[in-house]
């Protein structure tokens, strides 16, 4: 052989010899030869490398030839021939080993595992056992048998974390685990499947059906077949069929079967005597059986007569036979049985099955078990109502049941503890003769065992096991044996709890019982089938089977518990009859199995493909060797030992030293002086017993003993006031705090007099932090003077938590404490309009309203100064313990105080019924009440005049937790039908972003008391917030004697001051007169007599007027109960509507008259945010027809101009993003700021619209009067008043009734509402100042998107980032009044005709029926600008299309979209189109999706908004067809809403400027040319999904250019090949969500996956048929493939404008579209960009399938996925860039084949992650949800599914639902799929919401669809390219990112990988977030705003168990951090 032919090793080996030979020739090498040497060496290296690779050929699988020459058999255990033979056989073939229990199956497994462990050094050896104890036992056995190092072995069960398991798989070689863990790890990809070389399956007879064993083998085979399987079982199966199934599932190629009779087994098996004892039933049991058979005949005969049950002997029928008959009846129902008869037969079947189960119990277990079963039916615990009713009517049954009840009812109360106590007094009743026989056998056994008093027997106490199938029988046996203690020490052994009423054993308890039984604690164990297999229960001498098992497996398993080490005995106790026959049949089956396996091999088909695993040339030889092993250490012990550091503090765990780390000298000193010895008389230490005064002392008093040293906390106090020396570990901060406290205590101990500590900290005292509470007694004395005596005393706003929701408030001031006197209170009941069940409070508790009777007519009180203090006691806990039953309502108990002619002070006890409000209320007010009588102000209840503190306002900024709860009450209120709309007028929505609050707690601005203009609360420092205002209580109210009459009460006079928390308000005389009924209520406050000095009159508050139902927290009497709407529950108060009859409400110098009840002034107003330093108006008259507002306002107030802004923080704070469910009239406020032409219109008494006569309403004086206060402008930094408030022509109210409740939700309660009783004055949405930090930063206001209903537009300016709400195209006359603040709000009311084409809206007539409020009707006027319509959006699931721009802007504000970009400040509505066109297309490109349409497609379309389409970007770069569609859309008549329904083309991509501008080359495609086929749009349902997307036509020049670069050429070529001329098709506008249809131009010939939505798709019609073809070919005809229209429809995105609104939070209300609309226009569903716009609106699924019945293919839901031709290997796979799909961990159990196919068949990278509701994430923007057809059919899971869709829409741009056909069970006949109404409506709703629907025939096809979706997303550069596995540092940030609302898992992953830290992310701009997180700009702005939202720690709730915020609600970072912690 030449050197060139030798290998490297051959060349190197003999080179020395060869070299010497050659040198002997004496021929020197030539230079050429020398030069060739390097080349020869390279070739040799190549050959050597080839041989090395060949040796590592996968065919050998890493087999080590050196180790493979031998196989080791241990001799440290006795060698048994059968074990040796079976081991040799199992090494070379997949083997099933069947050995009786106790004969060494585990030993054989250990031998085989060890040899494969040697042969394959890099392979894995896996042992699987069904239970954890078996896993542990096998691991220990392998160590003892073969000595496998423990460091190479690992045990993995479900308790092992998945991350740890993946590490174990990579580091360990021999693994012991349960099959479920193996399945999970295979699915996760954690198992190196190709490295598994040996798989051992214990208890292999379980490998049936879809058990985890079968799944493991199926998964492994997908990776490799090169592994050995060893199956172990005592019995291969219950019959031949089961054995064959095991062989097939486990790939068994050989069976090694040994029975107890086998010759090679006999020498090693101990004798097992099997005794069969047959017991007759007996007379008593026989009689009961006879009676029971009669009962069975009664019910079974009915089925027999109907020919649905076979005619057989009734006693011989079995439960199984009846079940089979029922299944047969269901499959083939008789044609004569229809309708209700079928249900009756089903009920009879169920009843017979239950009765026959009881019959079996009677025969096998006895009467007691039967009684327990029947009692479960009769007492209703089993929920079988029909069976109970039927049985109750049967006389024989009731007699039998009564008899059993008398015998066993007392025993039924006995439990296991009673058994263990051995209740011997009670006589045991033997319910079955078998029990007596069992007792005899056991007693005989122990008697005979104890008689053998040999030494050997004494060492081994006998143990007995009793098996019974039912727990009731187990308990009965244990109770019987307890009578024979202590001879029989019995314990039960059952499995886990199987239901609510059963208590089982946990695994820990099971192991404890087994251990005690094995160790001798018990000698008798009564067990269910749990003890049959697996557990090592030690040697058992006697096995008793109390019942027979039909399966021989269970019988053999039971017998295997004995006869292992010594002789065993098995006793089977059988009842005569059926049980005996069952046992005999079982034994026969066992013999047949052994005979079939061992005798006739042809019966079973064995697996022929078992790999040899050993190379052919190698034949391992047996090598017996003695194996030694060390001591086995349990896993837990080793894990503890390996832990180098302790879990706390990182201190190294080390053994403690006796010297305690003391030096020798120190130790000796301690030992000599301090060590306690016996002489010290201290033998132990004890803690002193604690004493709880509230608990009874039941403990036993122990005698004190001197030997016990009682520890004391104060004993070492002298040592605890200084830090002691430390060693290595320093003192903690907690320790230092403790030391300082102890030092302070020690210092204070010796003080006398005034406390030095108090003096020291008094300068730092924050009064709002001081908490106190006061329980005012009923009819008792309130010592207010004593309460108000200390310095700087303010009101406390801390509610008592234990008060059940009631609050106590007393306000007083230091300066006027001398005027406060004790008064006797008489309580008056003023109840809320409607009482409701308490939501968060104590259930079932009611509040008794004390009805006091006022005796005095004079409501005034006078003191020395002629001033009257007002007190408001919101009693926290009434002495009688009453609780309010109505949530959100306030029960106001007015106390008319009488003393010294001062009966005018009204004490209002306002009991907040919302307990959660009281619980969450925070104390941010003053409370210097140091004594226990200190009272807490109710920071919830708008007690108008009683709360005098100027600090009250700021306290409302701390009530966010309470408002959240109350807002939840509002949500409940909304579940009722809405009020009518006819008379309601729009809410003027005031929004500002310019307000700056310097103080989060909203100081009371005392220094501005005399300021000529109002001052922003934020303008005061924290120091100022500590100042006190002059007490209003020093002033007196002059109360004319007025009485009010409430139904059911006597006339009381109530004096009240209409101020809640404004100390600077003037006293107003308010007169309430309820003339709508016979009762009258007059509350008068003196406007002129102020409570403060006259020089502080600038601080006066305007009088209280009353808002409508949306603002006022009013409490009406019973006369208001005719109002249909209950009060809104807001901020703990009740918001009732008003009566239809209104009386004048006068606000003058003396009186303010209203028809409202006396408590109607309990309002939430904007006073919390405002400082009203203006004069009150002299007179404002609210007449029956008009408001009279006389100018009496000082000139100084004319200067006080501010932009009245309202803040809605409900979007940011709360999850209350729902709607009232109706639109409110916008027309009623047409003249809100109109000119004099509208002045003559007056407001009727019943008109709630808020329209006022201009000539009667003069200048409101800077909103100081009720009109101005109604708008309640929020002070901006310029502190100016609203222009409309100063419009002398028209100072109108802002009516809240036109807006949904969600818009009017306040984050804070508002104080003094100023509005007329029927005038719906606008209740401000005040933003908690605590939500905004101090500093010059303005409010980051998040507009509620539902503002769109108001018809306002919002314009933002770059300079000030302010929001303008426009409703009028004309500037008002007061525009010049505004200051430099640009937050001008202009509102103009308009009326729009209703135009809901799908649903008849409520008209004015209907509304009048619904509501007692009758509005003055106005002639309808056509809209001239965007505004909302009352009637338009009656569909709760719609957003108003005319307000889409507003919502878009609103959304941009709310989500932090690009407000900083240059925008034109639009001043008028007339120019909105131009401004918006430039603004949206230019600056908002980043935040508006390319395919987004800012309108709800399912909305009425008659608005003039559609005439001027300003919601598109088409002015920048559009194609012609788009322009045509826009034009056709714009020319629709505003009055004929459906005259033209134009098809909307796909709008340009978001990155429009990166695309080539499109050319206008073809006039035919000009936007002004309408295709002639457009007229046919609505005529052909066949064409509905034939949407022309062929943009490669030459007329589309730019599209042609763009698409030809990718796929267009191929498309054209395909069309040319098939000689197909494409006809002109309708260009239905199917919007691809942020997608480009060019990406899907690739239409393969071989595969088409279609998706059908709606009816056509699901029914597989030809329009939207599901072509579910596998990779082999396409089921679509070639002509269909060549049809461009089909091509286009295949590319459509199933996108319909998502009708995602917030009317009903829990339902997807997708309004069903009309036939014409769906056909004529695929509505521009926007993908997620537009869905994000509605992100916080729950989708409404209210699809009516009947409306869709005529639109078979209507929903345009066909989405056809295309695979490129020849996609055998995807492009990315060829390029090495595999597509990645994230799969939810829950899919491991339900979608195992999907995951496996994705990974093995399609080669995708699959990562298992906890996706929290997302089944599959295929890209950064698309999520796929997999649902089975059965899940879609059922109505039970519909709501859950809807909620899931809602949540996903807030996180993903695209959602796809795969509806998968249910898997058919083996042997079941295929059932015809029957659609249900729920199924159709759900599909329709999904389509309407823009969700793509795909249909799949199975999991394999689902995987194929997922792959195609992933490839499409990959081509769009949206694929997942980041690893799903995070390192430890990044893993810590993941939970925080996931806590951000609306963030998906993939987005969080992107943020983890792209941002090095959370800090970097928090400091990133929205643009950076958008880039790194791969989200659109809007989502990035949302994240940015969430992170940067200013948070006040005082906003944290007391109780963290609040309802979670919805994902789209802007939470604060502090709340997120709190959740993380």
From Swiss-Prot:
Gene3D superfamilies: 3.40.50.10130, 5' to 3' exonuclease, C-terminal subdomain, hef helicase domain, P-loop containing nucleotide triphosphate hydrolases. The modification Phosphoserine is found at residues 30, 1637. This is Fanconi anemia group M protein homolog. Residues 1249-1259, 1370-1379 have a biased composition (Basic and acidic residues). Residues 86-254 form the Helicase ATP-binding domain. GO terms for biological process: interstrand cross-link repair; positive regulation of protein monoubiquitination; replication fork processing; resolution of meiotic recombination intermediates. The gene is Fancm. PROSITE patterns: HELICASE_ATP_BIND_1, HELICASE_CTER. Its main location: nucleus. Residues 1018-1035, 1684-1700 have a biased composition (Polar residues). GO terms for molecular function: 3'-5' DNA helicase activity; ATP binding; ATP hydrolysis activity; chromatin binding; DNA binding; nuclease activity; RNA helicase activity. Residues 437-612 form the Helicase C-terminal domain. It holds the Pfam family DEAD. InterPro entries: DEAD/DEAH_box_helicase_dom, ERCC4_domain, FANCM-MHF-bd, FANCM/Mph1-like_ID, FANCM_DEXDc, Helicase_ATP-bd, Helicase_C-like, P-loop_NTPase. Residues 638-657, 837-886, 1002-1049, 1244-1273, 1296-1319, 1369-1441, 1447-1466, 1615-1700, 1712-1732 are annotated as: Disordered. Component of the Fanconi anemia (FA) core complex, which consists of CENPS, CENPX, FANCA, FANCB, FANCC, FANCE, FANCF, FANCG, FANCL, FANCM, FAAP24 and FAAP100. The FA core complex associates with Bloom syndrome (BLM) complex, which consists of at least BLM, DNA topoisomerase 3-alpha/TOP3A, RMI1/BLAP75, RPA1/RPA70 and RPA2/RPA32. This supercomplex between FA and BLM complexes has been called BRAFT. Forms a discrete complex with CENPS and CENPX, called FANCM-MHF; this interaction stimulates DNA binding and replication fork remodeling by FANCM and stabilizes the binding partners. Residues 1689-2009 are annotated as: Interaction with FAAP24. Phosphorylated; hyperphosphorylated in response to genotoxic stress. A motif (DEAH box) lies at residues 202-205. Keywords: ATP-binding, DNA damage, DNA repair, DNA-binding, Helicase, Hydrolase, Nucleotide-binding, Nucleus, Phosphoprotein. Residues 1388-1397 have a biased composition (Basic residues). It is found in: Nucleus. ATP binds at residues 99-106. It catalyses: ATP + H2O = ADP + phosphate + H(+). Belongs to the DEAD box helicase family. DEAH subfamily. FANCM sub-subfamily.
């Amino acid at each position: 052989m030449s050197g060139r032919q030798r290998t490297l090793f051959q060349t190197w080996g003999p080179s020395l010899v060869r070299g010497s030979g050659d040198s002997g020739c004496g021929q020197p090498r030539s230079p050429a030869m020398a030069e060739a040497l390097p080349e020869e060496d390279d070739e040799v290296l190549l050959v050597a490398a080839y041989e090395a690779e060949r040796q590592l050929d996968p065919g050998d699988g890493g087999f080590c030839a050196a180790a493979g020459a031998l196989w080791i058999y241990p001799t440290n255990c006795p060698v048994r021939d059968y074990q040796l033979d079976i081991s040799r056989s199992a090494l070379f073939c997949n083997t099933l080993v069947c050995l009786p229990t106790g004969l060494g199956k585990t030993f054989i497994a250990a031998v085989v595992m060890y040899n494969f462990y040697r042969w394959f050094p890099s392979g894995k050896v896996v042992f699987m056992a069904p239970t954890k104890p078996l896993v542990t036992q096998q691991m220990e056995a392998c160590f003892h048998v073969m000595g496998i190092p423990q460091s190479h072995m690992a045990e993995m069960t479900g308790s092992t974390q998945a991350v740890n398991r993946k590490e174990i798989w990579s580091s360990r070689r021999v693994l012991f685990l349960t099959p479920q863990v193996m399945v999970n790890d295979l699915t996760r990809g954690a198992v190196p499947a190709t490295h598994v070389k040996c798989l051992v399956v214990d208890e292999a007879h379980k490998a049936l059906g879809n058990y985890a064993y079968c799944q493991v083998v199926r998964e492994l085979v997908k990776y490799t077949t090169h592994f050995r399987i060893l199956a172990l079982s005592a019995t291969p199966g219950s019959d031949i069929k089961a054995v064959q199934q095991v062989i097939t599932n486990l790939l068994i190629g050989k069976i090694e079967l040994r029975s107890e009779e086998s010759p090679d087994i006999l020498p090693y098996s101990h004798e097992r005597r099997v005794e069969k004892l047959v017991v007759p039933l007996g007379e008593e049991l026989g009689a009961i059986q006879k009676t029971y058979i009669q009962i069975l005949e009664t019910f079974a005969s009915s089925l027999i007569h109907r020919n649905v049950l076979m005619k057989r002997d009734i006693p011989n029928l079995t439960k199984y036979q009846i079940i089979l008959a029922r299944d047969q009846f269901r499959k083939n129902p008789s044609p004569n049985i229809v309708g209700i008869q079928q249900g009756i037969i089903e009920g009879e079947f169920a009843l017979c099955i239950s009765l026959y189960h009881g019959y079996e119990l009677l025969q096998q277990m006895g009467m007691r078990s039967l009684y327990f079963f029947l009692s479960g039916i009769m007492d209703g615990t089993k929920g079988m109502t029909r069976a109970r009713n039927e049985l109750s009517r049967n006389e024989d049954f009731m007699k039998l049941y009564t008899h059993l009840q008398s015998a066993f009812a007392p025993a039924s109360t006995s439990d296991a503890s009673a058994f263990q106590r051995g209740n011997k007094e009670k006589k045991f009743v033997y319910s079955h003769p078998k029990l007596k026989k069992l007792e005899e056998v056991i007693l005989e056994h122990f008697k005979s065992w104890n008689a053998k008093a040999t030494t050997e027997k004494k060492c081994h106490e006998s143990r007995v096991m009793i098996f019974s199938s039912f727990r009731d029988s187990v308990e009965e046996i244990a109770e019987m044996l307890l009578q024979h203690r202590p001879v029989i020490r019995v314990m039960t052994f059952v499995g886990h709890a199987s239901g609510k009423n059963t208590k089982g054993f946990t695994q820990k308890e099971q192991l404890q019982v087994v251990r005690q039984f094995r160790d001798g604690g018990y000698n008798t164990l009564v067990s269910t089938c749990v003890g049959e297999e697996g557990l090592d229960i030690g040697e058992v001498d006697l096995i008793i089977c109390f019942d027979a098992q039909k399966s021989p497996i269970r019988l053999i398993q039971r017998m295997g518990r004995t006869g292992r080490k010594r002789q065993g005995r098995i006793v089977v106790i059988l009842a005569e009859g059926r049980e005996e026959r069952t046992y005999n049949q079982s034994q026969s089956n066992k013999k047949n199995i052994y005979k079939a396996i061992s005798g006739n091999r042809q019966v079973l088909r064995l697996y022929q493909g078992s790999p040899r695993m050993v190379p052919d040339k190698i034949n391992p030889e047996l090598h017996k060797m003695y194996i030694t092993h060390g001591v086995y250490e349990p896993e837990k012990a080793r894990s503890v030992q390996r832990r180098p550091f302790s879990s706390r503090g990182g201190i190294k765990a080390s053994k403690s030293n006796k010297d305690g780390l003391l030096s020798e000298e120190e130790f000796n000193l301690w030992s000599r002086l301090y060590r306690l010895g016996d002489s010290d008389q201290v033998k132990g230490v004890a803690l002193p017993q604690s004493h709880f005064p509230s608990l009874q002392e039941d403990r036993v008093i122990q005698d004190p003993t001197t030997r016990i040293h009682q520890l004391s906390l104060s004993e070492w106090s002298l040592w605890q006031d200084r830090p002691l020396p430390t060693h290595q570990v320093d003192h903690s901060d907690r320790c230092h705090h403790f030391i300082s406290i102890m030092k302070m205590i020690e210092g204070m101990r010796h003080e006398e007099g005034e406390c030095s500590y108090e003096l020291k900290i008094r300068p730092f005292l924050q009064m709002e932090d001081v908490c106190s509470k006061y329980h005012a007694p009923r009819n008792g004395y309130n010592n207010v003077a004593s309460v108000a005596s200390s310095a700087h005393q303010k009101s406390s706003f801390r509610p008592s938590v234990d008060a059940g929701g009631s609050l106590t408030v007393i306000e007083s001031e230091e300066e006027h404490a001398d005027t406060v006197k004790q008064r006797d209170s008489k309580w008056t009941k003023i109840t809320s309009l409607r009482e409701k069940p308490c939501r968060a409070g104590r259930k079932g508790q009611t509040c008794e309203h004390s009805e006091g009777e006022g005796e005095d007519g004079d409501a005034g009180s006078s003191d020395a100064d002629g001033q009257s203090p007002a007190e408001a006691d919101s009693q926290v806990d009434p002495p009688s313990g009453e609780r309010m039953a109505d949530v959100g309502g306030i029960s106001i108990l007015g106390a008319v105080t009488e003393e010294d002619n001062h009966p005018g002070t009204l004490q209002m006890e306002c009991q907040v019924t919302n307990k959660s409000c009281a619980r969450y209320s925070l104390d941010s007010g003053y409370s210097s009440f140091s004594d226990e009588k200190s009272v807490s102000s109710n920071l919830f209840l708008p007690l108008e005049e009683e709360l005098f503190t100027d600090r009250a306002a700021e306290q409302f900024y701390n009530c966010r937790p309470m408002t959240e709860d109350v807002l939840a009450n509002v949500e409940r209120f909304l579940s009722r039908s809405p009020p009518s709309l006819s008379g309601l007028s729009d809410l003027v929505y005031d929004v500002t972003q310019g307000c700056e609050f310097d103080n989060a707690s909203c100081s009371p601005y005392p220094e501005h008391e005399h300021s000529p203009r109002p001052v922003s609360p934020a303008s005061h420092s924290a120091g100022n917030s500590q100042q006190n205002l002059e007490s209003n209580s020093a002033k007196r109210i002059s109360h004319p004697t007025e009485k009010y009459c409430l139904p059911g009460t006597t006339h009381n006079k109530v004096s009240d001051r209409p101020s809640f928390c404004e100390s600077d308000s003037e006293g107003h005389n308010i007169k309430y007169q309820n003339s709508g009924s016979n009762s009258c209520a007059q509350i008068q406050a003196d406007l002129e007599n102020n409570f403060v000095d006259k020089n502080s009159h600038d601080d006066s508050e305007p009088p209280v007027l009353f808002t409508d139902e949306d603002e006022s927290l009013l409490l009406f009497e019973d006369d208001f109960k005719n109002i249909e709407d209950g009060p809104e529950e807001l901020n703990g108060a009740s918001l009732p509507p008003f009566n239809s009859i209104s009386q004048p409400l006068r606000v003058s110098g003396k009186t303010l008259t209203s028809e409202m009840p006396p408590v109607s002034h309990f309002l939430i107003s904007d006073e919390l945010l405002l400082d009203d330093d203006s004069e009150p108006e002299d007179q404002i008259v609210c007449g029956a027809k008009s408001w009279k507002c006389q100018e009496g306002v000082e000139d100084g107030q004319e200067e006080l101009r501010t932009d009245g802004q309202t803040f809605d923080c409900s979007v940011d704070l709360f999850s209350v993003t729902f709607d009232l469910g109706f639109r409110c009239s916008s027309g009623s406020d047409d003249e809100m700021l109109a000119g004099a032409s509208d002045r003559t219109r007056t407001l009727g008494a019943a008109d709630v619209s808020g329209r006022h006569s201009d000539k009667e309403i003069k200048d409101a004086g800077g909103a100081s009067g009720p009109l101005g206060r109604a708008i309640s402008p929020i002070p901006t930094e310029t502190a100016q008043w609203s222009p409309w408030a100063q419009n002398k022509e028209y100072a109108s109210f802002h009516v809240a009734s036109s807006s949904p409740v969600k818009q009017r939700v306040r984050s804070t309660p508002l104080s003094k509402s100023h509005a007329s009783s029927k005038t719906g004055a606008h209740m401000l949405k005040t933003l908690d100042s605590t939500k905004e930090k101090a500093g010059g930063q303005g409010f980051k206001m998040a507009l509620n998107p539902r503002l769109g209903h108001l018809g306002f537009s919002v314009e933002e300016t770059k300079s000030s980032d302010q929001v303008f709400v426009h409703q009028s195209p004309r500037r008002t006359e007061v525009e010049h009044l505004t200051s430099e603040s640009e937050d001008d709000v202009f509102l103009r009311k308009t009326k729009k005709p209703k135009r809901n084409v799908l649903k008849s809206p409520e008209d004015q007539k209907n509304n009048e029926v619904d509501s007692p409020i009758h509005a003055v009707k106005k002639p309808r006027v056509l809209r001239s600008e965007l505004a909302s319509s009352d009637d338009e959006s009656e569909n709760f699931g719609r957003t108003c299309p005319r307000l889409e721009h507003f919502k878009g802007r609103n959304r941009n504000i709310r989500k932090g979209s690009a407000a900083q970009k240059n925008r034109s400040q639009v001043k008028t509505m007339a120019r909105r189109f131009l401004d918006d066109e430039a603004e949206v297309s230019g600056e908002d490109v980043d935040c508006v999706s390319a395919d987004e349409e800012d309108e709800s497609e399912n909305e009425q379309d008659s608005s003039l908004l559609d005439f001027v389409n300003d919601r598109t970007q088409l002015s920048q770069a559009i194609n012609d067809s788009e322009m045509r569609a826009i034009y056709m859309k714009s020319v629709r008549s505003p009055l004929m809403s459906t005259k033209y329904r134009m098809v909307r083309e796909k709008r340009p991509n978001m990155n429009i400027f990166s695309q080539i501008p499109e050319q206008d080359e073809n006039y035919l495609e000009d936007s002004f040319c309408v295709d002639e086929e457009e007229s046919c749009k609505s005529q052909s349902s066949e064409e509905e999904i034939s949407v022309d997307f062929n943009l490669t036509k030459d007329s589309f020049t730019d599209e042609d250019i763009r698409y030809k670069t990718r796929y267009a050429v191929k498309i054209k070529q395909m069309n040319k090949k098939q000689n197909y001329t494409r006809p002109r098709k309708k260009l239905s506008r199917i919007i691809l969500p942020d997608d480009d249809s060019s990406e899907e131009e690739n239409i393969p010939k071989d595969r088409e996956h279609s998706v059908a939505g709606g009816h056509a798709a699901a029914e597989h019609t030809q329009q939207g048929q599901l072509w579910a073809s596998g990779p082999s070919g396409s089921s679509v005809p070639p002509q269909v493939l060549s049809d461009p229209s089909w091509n286009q429809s295949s590319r459509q995105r199933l996108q319909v404008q998502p009708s995602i609104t917030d009317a009903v939070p829990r339902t997807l209300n997708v309004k069903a579209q009309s036939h014409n609309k769906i056909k004529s226009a695929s509505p521009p569903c926007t993908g997620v960009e537009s869905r994000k716009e509605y992100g916080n609106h729950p989708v409404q699924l209210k699809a009516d399938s009947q409306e869709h019945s005529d639109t078979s293919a209507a929903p345009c839901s066909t989405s056809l996925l295309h695979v490129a031709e020849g996609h055998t290997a995807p492009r990315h796979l060829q390029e090495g860039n595999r597509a990645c799909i994230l799969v939810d961990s829950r899919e491991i159990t339900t979608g195992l084949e999907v995951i496996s196919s994705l990974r093995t068949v399609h080669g995708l990278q699959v990562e298992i992650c906890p996706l929290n509701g997302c089944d599959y994430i295929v890209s950064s923007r698309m999520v796929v949800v997999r649902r089975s057809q059965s899940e879609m059919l059922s109505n039970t899971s519909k709501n859950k599914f809807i909620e899931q869709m809602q949540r996903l829409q807030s996180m993903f741009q695209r959602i796809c639902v795969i509806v998968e056909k249910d898997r058919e069970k083996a042997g079941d006949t295929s059932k015809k799929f029957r659609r249900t109404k729920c199924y159709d409506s759900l599909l329709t709703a999904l389509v309407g919401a823009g969700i793509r629907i795909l249909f799949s025939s199975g999991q394999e096809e689902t995987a194929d669809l997922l792959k195609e979706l992933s490839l499409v997303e990959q081509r769009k550069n949206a694929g997942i390219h980041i690893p799903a596995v995070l390192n430890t540092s990044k893993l810590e940030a993941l939970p925080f990112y996931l806590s951000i609302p609306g963030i998906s898992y993939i987005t969080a992953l992107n943020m983890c990988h792209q941002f090095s830290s959370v800090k970097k992310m928090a400091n990133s701009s929205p643009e950076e977030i958008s880039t790194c997180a791969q989200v659109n700009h809007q989502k990035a702005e949302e994240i940015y705003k969430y992170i940067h939202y200013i948070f006040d720690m005082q906003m944290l709730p007391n109780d963290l168990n609040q309802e979670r915020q919805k994902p789209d609600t802007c939470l604060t970072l502090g709340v997120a951090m709190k959740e993380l912690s």
